[in-house]
């Protein structure tokens, strides 16, 4: 079974409760629990890493000899981060899920380390505000930082990480939708998953990477191998070209002779436009945030960032007013280099911003004059030892956008039992995307854990 882009399952669907719940779908339609697929991949990485390190010395290496760093998209939520730790544990990388031998590093943070430490150290100085635009295959992740010092390097997060599922595979999906429309459902179904299909994708990848959106640019596709899966000869290919062009504006007409199909610039650009529009809108919203202030540098990293079309869009949106867009010399390697730096220098990020509001359900005295209390009164009220009716409330410990202490410890809050005879207190830990939450309503909060004291 061949699984592609399975990492995106954790980005595309939320609300999972169990680690075994997400499913990965293979090219042939077969389904397996995502944890099985992810564990197999991480186990392979582990075995390859140990074999390589062992080959460099006369001593056989084990997992205990290695400090592991697993890079993840910045848009992964708490569930997804826990999922990756469980997968690493099942793969034998760590002995316990919470082992300190494994660190999770956000991909744009790794890139930020690489850019400020090695690729562009001359650009960063104390007070400099930078944005990392990490454009990969599946996701686009954006983090924003202020340089506090250079020796030692210390960075402060300005805004919570943001981004979305707008990687280069979205452009690939648009191209594959065109293939389906062009060839027809029957021919496309016969082609999908074959070696000829991946040969076509390789041709597309070559053209996509270099495409800059110029009016005279074209992408040429050799359909010889494709033709073998649908008895498509030169005459049939001409019919397919004519059928597609019918109803299309002239600038989107495909051309070519025999089994060659040439995609015009306007058509290729239409594959990019929705994805780049999503990225630009996110960049615009981030830069306009009043909490961020003046931006000096934007570092472009990730494989998709090498796209001339994407680079031009980022520069059009961000450059000016003292801001410069800097593309990494080796955009696909920046995250790997940064992860290696992160392994020994995780404390470089002195302050991070909370992406969610976290708190617990506690109790307050019911007030019949408060309409919010009346609205939330239950059919089976709870009373304290003094006979006072109690109602659930939300007690926040940290709010979205607030600084997370470097040691992860929030200010202490005190709670007392509703009944003096209680021997334990049960807390339900909730999170919310909103800042000001007073009550644990289901449409405003969601559960993340439980604690019994």
Predicted features by range, described:
Residues 1-21, 97, 103, 154-155, ...:
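Early-domain small/polar-rich strand-loop-helix modules and first-structured segments
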Residues 3-132, 195, 199, 213-214, ...:
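Nucleotide/phosphate-binding catalytic cleft detector across ATP-hydrolyzing
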Residues 82-87, 305-322:
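Conserved helicase motor "Helicase C" RecA-like lobe of SF1/SF2 P-loop NTPases
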Residues 40-59, 110-121, 126, 253, ...:
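Phosphate/ATP-binding catalytic cores across multiple sugar-kinase/actin-like superfamilies
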Residues 117-157, 175, 358, 370:
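Gly/Thr-rich phosphate-binding beta-strand-loop-beta motif of the actin/hexokinase/Hsp70
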Residues 10, 33, 73-75, 166-315, ...:
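Gly/charged contiguous loops adjacent to phosphate- or pyrophosphate-bearing nucleotide/cofactor binding elements
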Residues 92-106, 110, 314-338:
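Conserved phosphate-binding/catalytic loops in two-lobed NTP-binding clefts
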Residues 232-274, 279, 349-453:
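Acidic low-complexity intrinsically disordered segments
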